[in-house]
């Protein structure tokens, strides 16, 4: 697999933050990422604050980093930001041994994940009556 030959280029109204090697399985992390996908940043932060999932704090920290990148690096208005993309990638799998009875051992796999969050500035159209 590895890196993509032509990674996706960010548009002028987008900002990105990446959290690498997070100690959680991609399946569990994707549940939280799907929860914020497509929402306004304020609503997504509120959802993550009150989520009972263990990994929600790390996702919130990454989202706050994306918002800070949008504000400081791209001069975007943070009140009109939307979570455009939130996707999860598979990272390494750490192998450990678990001692069992009768001199046996079994293998435990501890998966890691990558998280990428892209926020986009959306200008809402005002209808004139």
Swiss-Prot record:
One of its GO terms (molecular function) is rRNA binding. GO terms for cellular component: cytosolic large ribosomal subunit. Coiled coil: none annotated. Pfam families: Ribosomal_L22. Keywords: Ribonucleoprotein, Ribosomal protein, RNA-binding, rRNA-binding. One of its GO terms (biological process) is translation. It comes from the Bacteria. SUPFAM superfamilies: Ribosomal protein L22 (SSF54843). This protein binds specifically to 23S rRNA; its binding is stimulated by other ribosomal proteins, e.g. L4, L17, and L20. It is important during the early stages of 50S assembly. It makes multiple contacts with different domains of the 23S rRNA in the assembled 50S subunit and ribosome. The globular domain of the protein is located near the polypeptide exit tunnel on the outside of the subunit, while an extended beta-hairpin is found that lines the wall of the exit tunnel in the center of the 70S ribosome. Belongs to the universal ribosomal protein uL22 family. Part of the 50S ribosomal subunit. This is Large ribosomal subunit protein uL22. It comes from Bartonella henselae (strain ATCC 49882 / DSM 28221 / CCUG 30454 / Houston 1) (Rochalimaea henselae). The gene is rplV.
């Amino acid at each position: 697999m590895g890196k993509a030959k032509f990674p996706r280029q960010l548009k002028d109204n987008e900002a990105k933050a990446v959290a690498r090697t997070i100690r959680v399985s991609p399946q569990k992390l994707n549940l939280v990422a799907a929860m914020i996908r497509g929402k306004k940043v304020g609503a997504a932060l509120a959802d993550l604050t009150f989520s009972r999932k263990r990994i929600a704090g790390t996702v919130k920290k990454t989202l706050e980093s994306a918002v800070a990148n949008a504000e400081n690096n791209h001069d975007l208005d943070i009140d009109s930001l939307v979570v455009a993309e939130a996707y999860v990638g598979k990272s390494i799998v750490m192998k450990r041994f678990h001692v069992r009875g009768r001199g046996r051992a079994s293998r435990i796999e501890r998966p890691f994940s990558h998280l990428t969050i892209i926020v986009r500035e959306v200008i809402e159209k005002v209808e004139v009556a």
